[in-house]
Amino acid sequence: MTTAQPDAQPGAQPIADLGLKPGQLHLNPGVDDLYAHAIRLGEGVQAATGPLTVRTNKTGRSPKDRFIVEDDQTRETVWWEGFNQPISAEVFDRLLDKMVKYAEGRELFVQQVFAGTDAEHRIPVRMITEMAYHSLFIRNMFVRPTAEELQNFQAEWTVLNIPSFKADPAVDGTRTDTFILVNFSKKMIIAGGTQYAGENKKGIFGVLNYLLPAKGIMPMHCSANVGEDGDVALFFGLSGTGKTTLSADPGRKLIGDDEHGWTDTGVFNFEGGCYAKVINLSAEAEPAIYQTTRNYGTVLENVVLDESGTPDLDDGSLTENTRSAYPIEQIANIQPGSVGGIPKNVVFLTADAFGVLPPLSRLTPEQMMYQFISGFTAKIPGTEEGVTDPTPTFSTCFGAPFMPRHPGEYARLLAQKVEESGAKVWLVNTGWTGGKYGEGHRMSLNLTRLKSRDSHFADHCPPKQV
């Protein structure tokens, strides 16, 4: 059994404790090796411009196939409504045992990474995958340990993701042959049946969303950036509402594009990379993100290549949910360490598909609580399996599929943070104007960015009823 690649670092915790007996094991392989493995295994091809391009059997998340083990730890602490579906420990153990047996003799990839840039609050995670491209995605998206940290790496959480393993709903107690099961007592996530790489990061996001509130830390589905004067802004929103785009502002330094924690001293990124939606992306409107789609090391998910092998970002024939996964270092204007101070502005993004909401509104504390709990927006085509038209949705906390606790816990914690910090709260419409989707037009990026910049300086703007 091969246990190392040329650039691999020997971690202190391999995978024998799980009973896994792979035919070949790649521990912490680097970018060059993962390109070679992904191409050899037929997972993808290298675009003429450099990125690794892949196609997946599912082109979005599968929130209806996600389950949490109900046991003594979670029975009273998880909100068993909406997206939080219970499953028994026996079902989890049975599926894990079947996965371990299925993986025997197969080729596996392991990345040892951190979730979180704050050394005090991060968690070390062991990500075991069947696909080389998933391993590159994980390397891009999570925080990579130093060589010294790898020498003594001890994972607190483990993710085992084998897309070719499919559950039998009649036997295994799942909804379909796809499953994402979270076990807080065993500190483990197992997944099968889906190649969509976003499940890897969202699974751990859900773990942090459960763990951090108990420490007084507000976990957030938001992007964050910081101005020259140190003023931090947060952008809450569902997938496709503009979090990544607006946070990558040439005039401000990027902290992160999707997942953050708010402590008593500031904010920190949960990730080490970005996962940008790139359909119809242009170099003129979004030069920083566009450039990542041309870089070696980037993973392009479900992006079509033209005859010359160049990514065609305007082609949505596979899905509207085309994605670019890249290390945050590919963005030139980033905040060192991906941490910032106490936020001064909190922006709620909503992609109103009906042309009703105003472009910019300042919210009162009561309005903030209402908007955060209701989380009105529209699901954008492609971000979830089966969503082909914008659909009005009320996603609590701007991330209901990832929030294991009761929404009230998150709302009270956010209200406490906002009150203590004196941050201003805004509602910005990134959706349609002049009519609904298909009739009007979407707010231009430049206009939306100007609105969000205005919010940083509009101290004179009082809250208004919306």
UniProtKB/Swiss-Prot annotation:
Which PROSITE patterns does its entry note? PEPCK_ATP
**Which residues are ATP-binding?**
202, 221, 237-245, 286, 323, 448
User: GO molecular function, one example?
Assistant: phosphoenolpyruvate carboxykinase (ATP) activity
Q: Which reaction does it catalyse?
A: oxaloacetate + ATP = phosphoenolpyruvate + ADP + CO2
Indicate which residues the UniProt annotation says bind Mn(2+): 202, 221, 258
Q: Which GO terms describe its cellular component?
A: cytosol
Compartments, as annotated in UniProt: Cytoplasm
At the top of the EC hierarchy, this enzyme's class is lyase
Enzyme Commission number: 4.1.1.49
The pathway entry for this protein reads as: Carbohydrate biosynthesis; gluconeogenesis
Q: Which UniProt keywords apply?
A: ATP-binding, Cytoplasm, Decarboxylase, Gluconeogenesis, Lyase, Manganese, Metal-binding, Nucleotide-binding
| NCBIfam families, alphabetized | pckA (TIGR00224), PRK09344.1-2 (NF006820), PRK09344.1-3 (NF006821)
Record-given protein name: Phosphoenolpyruvate carboxykinase (ATP)
Q: Which organism is it from?
A: Deinococcus radiodurans (strain ATCC 13939 / DSM 20539 / JCM 16871 / CCUG 27074 / LMG 4051 / NBRC 15346 / NCIMB 9279 / VKM B-1422 / R1)
